[in-house]
Protein backbone atom coordinates (compact mmCIF):
# COMPACT_ATOMS: atom_id res chain seq x y z
CA UNK A 1 0.00 0.00 0.00
CA UNK A 2 2.80 2.41 0.87
CA UNK A 3 4.60 1.62 -2.40
CA UNK A 4 1.42 2.24 -4.41
CA UNK A 5 0.81 5.52 -2.60
CA UNK A 6 4.39 6.62 -3.15
CA UNK A 7 4.13 5.73 -6.85
CA UNK A 8 1.08 7.98 -7.21
CA UNK A 9 2.94 10.81 -5.46
CA UNK A 10 6.00 10.24 -7.64
CA UNK A 11 3.97 10.65 -10.81
CA UNK A 12 3.02 14.15 -9.62
CA UNK A 13 6.43 14.99 -8.17
CA UNK A 14 9.13 13.13 -10.08
CA UNK A 15 12.12 14.40 -8.09
CA UNK A 16 15.09 12.97 -6.23
CA UNK A 17 13.62 14.28 -3.01
CA UNK A 18 10.43 12.27 -3.51
CA UNK A 19 12.48 9.14 -4.24
CA UNK A 20 14.63 9.74 -1.18
CA UNK A 21 11.57 10.13 1.03
CA UNK A 22 10.43 6.58 0.32
CA UNK A 23 13.88 5.18 1.07
CA UNK A 24 13.95 7.08 4.35
CA UNK A 25 10.51 5.74 5.21
CA UNK A 26 11.70 2.17 4.61
CA UNK A 27 14.58 2.70 7.05
CA UNK A 28 12.25 4.20 9.68
CA UNK A 29 9.74 1.37 9.32
CA UNK A 30 12.44 -1.31 9.57
CA UNK A 31 14.21 0.18 12.58
CA UNK A 32 11.14 1.29 14.53
CA UNK A 33 10.83 -0.47 17.93
CA UNK A 34 7.77 -2.67 18.39
CA UNK A 35 6.42 -0.65 21.32
CA UNK A 36 5.80 2.52 19.28
CA UNK A 37 2.09 3.37 19.09
CA UNK A 38 2.14 6.52 16.95
CA UNK A 39 4.36 8.46 14.58
CA UNK A 40 4.51 12.26 14.58
CA UNK A 41 6.00 14.53 11.91
CA UNK A 42 7.20 17.94 13.03
CA UNK A 43 6.98 19.56 9.58
CA UNK A 44 4.48 19.17 6.76
CA UNK A 45 6.89 18.79 3.84
CA UNK A 46 9.58 16.04 3.77
CA UNK A 47 9.16 14.85 7.40
CA UNK A 48 5.41 14.35 6.91
CA UNK A 49 5.96 12.43 3.66
CA UNK A 50 8.44 10.08 5.33
CA UNK A 51 6.15 9.66 8.33
CA UNK A 52 3.12 8.99 6.15
CA UNK A 53 4.82 6.22 4.16
CA UNK A 54 6.39 4.66 7.27
CA UNK A 55 3.11 4.75 9.19
CA UNK A 56 1.38 2.83 6.40
CA UNK A 57 4.20 0.28 6.29
CA UNK A 58 3.87 -0.35 10.02
CA UNK A 59 0.10 0.04 10.30
CA UNK A 60 0.38 2.92 12.76
CA UNK A 61 -1.61 6.14 13.17
CA UNK A 62 0.23 9.39 12.66
CA UNK A 63 -0.09 13.09 13.35
CA UNK A 64 1.80 16.23 12.47
CA UNK A 65 2.88 19.79 13.20
CA UNK A 66 3.13 22.59 10.64
CA UNK A 67 4.90 25.92 10.91
CA UNK A 68 5.69 28.28 8.02
CA UNK A 69 7.83 27.29 5.03
CA UNK A 70 6.45 23.76 5.14
CA UNK A 71 2.90 25.14 4.85
CA UNK A 72 3.45 27.73 2.15
CA UNK A 73 5.86 25.91 -0.18
CA UNK A 74 4.31 22.42 -0.13
CA UNK A 75 2.02 21.77 -3.14
CA UNK A 76 -1.68 21.88 -2.31
CA UNK A 77 -2.27 18.35 -3.60
CA UNK A 78 0.42 17.05 -1.24
CA UNK A 79 -1.10 18.85 1.74
CA UNK A 80 -4.58 17.52 0.89
CA UNK A 81 -3.28 13.95 0.71
CA UNK A 82 -1.54 14.23 4.08
CA UNK A 83 -4.43 15.94 5.85
CA UNK A 84 -6.71 13.24 4.53
CA UNK A 85 -4.87 10.39 6.25
CA UNK A 86 -3.38 11.75 9.49
CA UNK A 87 -5.32 11.85 12.76
CA UNK A 88 -4.65 15.46 13.67
CA UNK A 89 -2.32 18.35 12.96
CA UNK A 90 -1.34 21.40 14.99
CA UNK A 91 0.00 24.65 13.61
CA UNK A 92 1.26 27.81 15.29
CA UNK A 93 -0.51 30.69 13.52
CA UNK A 94 -4.14 31.49 12.79
CA UNK A 95 -3.24 32.37 9.20
CA UNK A 96 -1.65 28.95 8.74
CA UNK A 97 -4.57 27.17 10.37
CA UNK A 98 -7.10 28.99 8.19
CA UNK A 99 -5.21 28.04 5.03
CA UNK A 100 -4.76 24.40 6.01
CA UNK A 101 -8.44 24.05 6.90
CA UNK A 102 -9.37 25.04 3.35
CA UNK A 103 -7.37 22.03 2.14
CA UNK A 104 -8.39 19.49 4.78
CA UNK A 105 -11.18 17.00 4.03
CA UNK A 106 -12.20 17.56 7.66
CA UNK A 107 -11.28 21.07 8.89
CA UNK A 108 -11.55 19.85 12.49
CA UNK A 109 -8.36 17.90 11.86
CA UNK A 110 -6.37 21.15 12.10
CA UNK A 111 -5.84 22.84 15.48
CA UNK A 112 -4.15 26.12 16.39
CA UNK A 113 -1.54 26.14 19.17
CA UNK A 114 0.52 29.32 19.31
CA UNK A 115 4.13 29.05 20.38
CA UNK A 116 4.68 30.25 23.93
CA UNK A 117 7.50 31.97 25.76
CA UNK A 118 9.01 30.66 28.98
CA UNK A 119 9.25 33.72 31.22
CA UNK A 120 11.52 31.87 33.62
CA UNK A 121 14.14 32.10 30.85
CA UNK A 122 13.06 35.47 29.45
CA UNK A 123 12.34 37.46 32.58
CA UNK A 124 11.74 41.11 31.66
CA UNK A 125 14.11 43.74 33.01
CA UNK A 126 12.86 46.19 35.59
CA UNK A 127 11.07 49.08 33.90
CA UNK A 128 13.29 51.66 35.62
CA UNK A 129 16.37 49.71 34.59
CA UNK A 130 15.32 49.65 30.94
CA UNK A 131 14.27 53.31 30.84
CA UNK A 132 17.38 54.79 32.42
CA UNK A 133 18.23 58.47 32.75
CA UNK A 134 21.07 57.96 30.27
CA UNK A 135 19.51 56.68 27.04
CA UNK A 136 21.63 55.09 24.35
CA UNK A 137 23.61 57.56 22.26
CA UNK A 138 23.47 56.62 19.49
CA UNK A 139 20.11 54.82 19.58
CA UNK A 140 20.38 51.10 18.90
CA UNK A 141 18.25 49.37 16.26
CA UNK A 142 18.51 45.59 16.51
CA UNK A 143 17.44 42.72 14.32
CA UNK A 144 17.92 39.01 14.92
CA UNK A 145 17.34 36.64 12.04
CA UNK A 146 18.93 34.57 9.30
CA UNK A 147 20.16 36.46 6.27
CA UNK A 148 17.63 34.94 3.86
CA UNK A 149 15.19 36.67 1.48
CA UNK A 150 12.04 36.24 3.61
CA UNK A 151 13.54 38.29 6.45
CA UNK A 152 13.46 41.41 4.28
CA UNK A 153 16.89 42.76 5.15
CA UNK A 154 17.35 44.46 1.78
CA UNK A 155 14.24 46.49 2.62
CA UNK A 156 15.69 47.19 6.05
CA UNK A 157 18.94 48.55 4.62
CA UNK A 158 17.05 50.80 2.21
CA UNK A 159 14.91 52.06 5.10
CA UNK A 160 18.00 52.82 7.17
CA UNK A 161 19.58 54.69 4.27
CA UNK A 162 16.44 56.86 4.02
CA UNK A 163 16.42 57.98 7.66
CA UNK A 164 16.87 61.73 8.23
CA UNK A 165 20.53 62.69 8.68
CA UNK A 166 19.96 64.32 12.08
CA UNK A 167 19.13 60.99 13.72
CA UNK A 168 21.97 59.33 15.63
CA UNK A 169 21.58 55.54 15.41
CA UNK A 170 23.42 52.27 14.96
CA UNK A 171 22.04 49.05 13.49
CA UNK A 172 23.15 45.71 14.93
CA UNK A 173 22.32 42.41 13.25
CA UNK A 174 22.59 39.00 14.89
CA UNK A 175 22.42 35.92 12.67
CA UNK A 176 24.18 34.00 9.95
CA UNK A 177 22.85 33.02 6.57
CA UNK A 178 23.70 32.81 2.87
CA UNK A 179 22.96 36.48 2.09
CA UNK A 180 25.18 37.94 4.80
CA UNK A 181 28.05 38.95 2.50
CA UNK A 182 25.61 40.37 -0.04
CA UNK A 183 23.97 42.47 2.68
CA UNK A 184 27.35 43.75 3.85
CA UNK A 185 28.15 44.80 0.29
CA UNK A 186 24.77 46.52 -0.06
CA UNK A 187 25.27 48.37 3.21
CA UNK A 188 28.64 49.57 1.92
CA UNK A 189 27.05 50.71 -1.33
CA UNK A 190 24.47 52.70 0.63
CA UNK A 191 27.16 54.34 2.73
CA UNK A 192 25.99 52.64 5.93
CA UNK A 193 29.07 50.59 6.83
CA UNK A 194 30.04 52.89 9.72
CA UNK A 195 26.58 52.60 11.28
CA UNK A 196 26.11 48.83 11.07
CA UNK A 197 27.65 45.96 12.98
CA UNK A 198 27.16 42.41 11.74
CA UNK A 199 27.56 40.10 14.74
CA UNK A 200 26.93 36.77 13.02
CA UNK A 201 25.28 33.81 14.71
CA UNK A 202 25.40 34.03 18.51
CA UNK A 203 24.32 31.85 21.46
CA UNK A 204 21.03 32.66 23.13
CA UNK A 205 22.64 34.43 26.07
CA UNK A 206 24.34 36.92 23.75
CA UNK A 207 21.13 37.40 21.77
CA UNK A 208 19.24 38.19 24.97
CA UNK A 209 21.88 40.71 26.02
CA UNK A 210 21.66 42.40 22.62
CA UNK A 211 17.87 42.61 22.88
CA UNK A 212 18.06 44.16 26.34
CA UNK A 213 20.32 46.98 25.18
CA UNK A 214 18.26 47.80 22.07
CA UNK A 215 15.94 50.79 21.69
CA UNK A 216 14.01 49.36 18.73
CA UNK A 217 13.75 45.81 17.39
CA UNK A 218 12.97 45.48 13.69
CA UNK A 219 12.10 42.42 11.58
CA UNK A 220 10.78 43.33 8.09
CA UNK A 221 9.48 39.89 7.09
CA UNK A 222 8.13 39.40 3.56
CA UNK A 223 6.96 36.69 1.16
CA UNK A 224 9.42 35.31 -1.39
CA UNK A 225 8.49 34.36 -4.98
CA UNK A 226 8.24 30.66 -4.08
CA UNK A 227 5.71 31.43 -1.33
CA UNK A 228 8.10 31.07 1.61
CA UNK A 229 7.44 33.38 4.54
CA UNK A 230 7.72 33.57 8.29
CA UNK A 231 4.96 32.24 10.51
CA UNK A 232 5.16 34.06 13.82
CA UNK A 233 8.87 34.55 14.57
CA UNK A 234 9.69 33.64 18.17
CA UNK A 235 12.26 36.43 18.29
CA UNK A 236 9.47 39.03 18.16
CA UNK A 237 8.02 37.59 21.37
CA UNK A 238 11.49 37.50 22.89
CA UNK A 239 12.07 41.16 22.06
CA UNK A 240 8.72 42.20 23.49
CA UNK A 241 9.38 40.19 26.64
CA UNK A 242 12.37 42.47 27.28
CA UNK A 243 10.38 45.73 27.04
CA UNK A 244 11.69 46.65 23.61
CA UNK A 245 9.52 48.45 21.04
CA UNK A 246 9.02 46.21 18.01
CA UNK A 247 8.59 47.11 14.33
CA UNK A 248 7.60 44.43 11.83
CA UNK A 249 5.25 43.75 8.91
CA UNK A 250 1.72 42.54 8.26
CA UNK A 251 2.94 39.10 7.29
CA UNK A 252 1.36 35.73 8.16
CA UNK A 253 0.89 35.39 11.92
CA UNK A 254 2.77 38.53 12.97
CA UNK A 255 -0.44 40.61 13.40
CA UNK A 256 -1.65 37.91 15.80
CA UNK A 257 1.10 39.06 18.16
CA UNK A 258 1.64 42.72 17.29
CA UNK A 259 -1.40 45.01 17.31
CA UNK A 260 -0.40 47.95 15.12
CA UNK A 261 -0.12 51.16 17.12
CA UNK A 262 -0.94 49.37 20.37
CA UNK A 263 1.74 46.77 21.09
CA UNK A 264 4.12 47.60 18.27
CA UNK A 265 4.20 48.98 14.74
CA UNK A 266 3.40 47.10 11.53
CA UNK A 267 4.00 48.17 7.94
CA UNK A 268 3.28 46.59 4.57
CA UNK A 269 5.83 43.91 3.63
CA UNK A 270 8.38 45.15 1.12
CA UNK A 271 7.57 48.85 1.67
CA UNK A 272 10.95 50.29 2.63
CA UNK A 273 9.60 53.87 2.66
CA UNK A 274 6.93 52.97 5.22
CA UNK A 275 9.53 51.05 7.20
CA UNK A 276 11.80 54.09 7.24
CA UNK A 277 8.97 56.40 8.32
CA UNK A 278 8.03 54.05 11.17
CA UNK A 279 11.64 53.77 12.29
CA UNK A 280 11.95 57.55 12.27
CA UNK A 281 8.85 57.94 14.46
CA UNK A 282 10.14 55.42 16.96
CA UNK A 283 13.63 56.87 17.12
CA UNK A 284 12.34 60.41 17.59
CA UNK A 285 9.74 59.59 20.25
CA UNK A 286 11.03 57.88 23.43
CA UNK A 287 7.59 58.11 25.03
CA UNK A 288 6.06 56.17 22.13
CA UNK A 289 8.80 53.54 22.37
CA UNK A 290 8.17 53.14 26.10
CA UNK A 291 4.40 52.88 25.63
CA UNK A 292 4.64 50.25 22.89
CA UNK A 293 7.34 48.33 24.76
CA UNK A 294 5.24 48.06 27.92
CA UNK A 295 2.08 47.12 26.01
CA UNK A 296 4.02 44.53 24.01
CA UNK A 297 5.35 42.95 27.18
CA UNK A 298 1.88 42.78 28.68
CA UNK A 299 0.42 41.14 25.56
CA UNK A 300 3.15 38.50 25.36
CA UNK A 301 2.78 37.75 29.05
CA UNK A 302 -1.03 37.50 28.89
CA UNK A 303 -1.45 35.71 25.55
CA UNK A 304 1.79 33.88 24.72
CA UNK A 305 3.42 32.83 28.00
CA UNK A 306 3.92 29.18 28.88
Task: Report each predicted region and the residues it spans.
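Conserved acidic donor-binding segment of nucleotide-sugar-dependent glycosyltransferases
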Residues: 257-261, 265-272, 281-287
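Acidic anion/phosphate-binding donor-loop and adjacent secondary structure
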Residues: 75-77, 101, 117-133, 137
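Carbohydrate-associated surface elements
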Residues: 95, 116
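Short hydrophobic beta-strand element within catalytic cores of glycosyltransferases
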Residues: 236, 241, 245-248, 258
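Acidic donor-binding loop of glycosyltransferase active sites
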Residues: 212-229, 244
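Short alpha-helical donor nucleotide-sugar binding micro-motif in glycosyltransferases
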Residues: 201-203, 209-214
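Conserved donor-binding/catalytic core segment of Leloir-type glycosyltransferases
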Residues: 133-161, 172
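Nucleotide-activated donor-binding/catalytic signature segment of Leloir-type glycosyltransferases, i.e.
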Residues: 174, 181-205
Amino acid sequence: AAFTLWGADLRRDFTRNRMRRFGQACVVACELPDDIDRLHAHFLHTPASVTRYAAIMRGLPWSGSAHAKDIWTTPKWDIREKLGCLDWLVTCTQSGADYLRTLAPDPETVSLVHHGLDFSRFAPPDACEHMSDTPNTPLIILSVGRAVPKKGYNDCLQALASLPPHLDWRFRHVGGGPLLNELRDRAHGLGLEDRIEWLGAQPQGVVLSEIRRADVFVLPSKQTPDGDRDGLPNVLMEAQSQRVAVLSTRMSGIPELILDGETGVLVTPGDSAALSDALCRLLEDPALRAKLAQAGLERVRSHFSM
